[in-house]
Amino acid sequence: MVFIADYGAGNLRSVLKAFEFLGIKAIVSNDPRKMAGYRKVLLPGVGAFGQAMQSLEALGFVSALLEHVDKGGHLLGICLGMQLLLSESEEMGTHKGLNLVPGKVKHFVSSSDKIPQIGWNAVDFSKQSDLFRNVADHSFFYFVHSYYCETESVEAVAATTLFAGQNFCSAIEKNGIFAVQFHPEKSADAGLKVLANFAEL
């Protein structure tokens, strides 16, 4: 079973429907106390980094997520949820993140590519990954974002994607912490396989 954290940051229902389609039990809750009974927690998100962190803190999710990871639970961040795992973001000022993955969230610099990135792009694997088990390298996934994650350690990077002249980290996998910048729930069969792989860990 998968616990989906509801902190008012969007795309919850589409993620829940994806798990339902896969026949995987999942619940959506804004009560972090209920998280204790789940080994797998999903942190989705669409919106602004600073506001999201405020919501997580106000609801009690910050301490609950840190405790979940500390106890060996699995955590998957999606889109903004991935960015929140890092140390800080430069989105609309400087904001502190969960610091589960040391690094910084940065804005794409101006280029010939239109920012934000909206649409399908290839994901190239950086290492053998549980999250991408039985998914073909260079598969295409659906992205919607203007900011990207720059991790301090290359060991945390599970996959990269080229956009706006930047070969950025599009997936993280380290010590039970997983994250993807793309939306697996909107990424057809490859995305559904990523969600299934997480649920089956």
UniProtKB/Swiss-Prot annotation:
Gene it is expressed from: hisH
Q: In which pathway does it act?
A: Amino-acid biosynthesis; L-histidine biosynthesis; L-histidine from 5-phospho-alpha-D-ribose 1-diphosphate: step 5/9
Q: What is this protein called?
A: Imidazole glycerol phosphate synthase subunit HisH
- Would the keyword Amino-acid biosynthesis turn up in this protein's UniProt record? yes
> Where does this protein reside within or beyond the cell?
Cytoplasm
EC numbers for this chain = 4.3.2.10, 3.5.1.2
GO MF, one annotated term: lyase activity
Q: Which UniProt keywords apply?
A: Amino-acid biosynthesis, Cytoplasm, Glutamine amidotransferase, Histidine biosynthesis, Hydrolase, Lyase
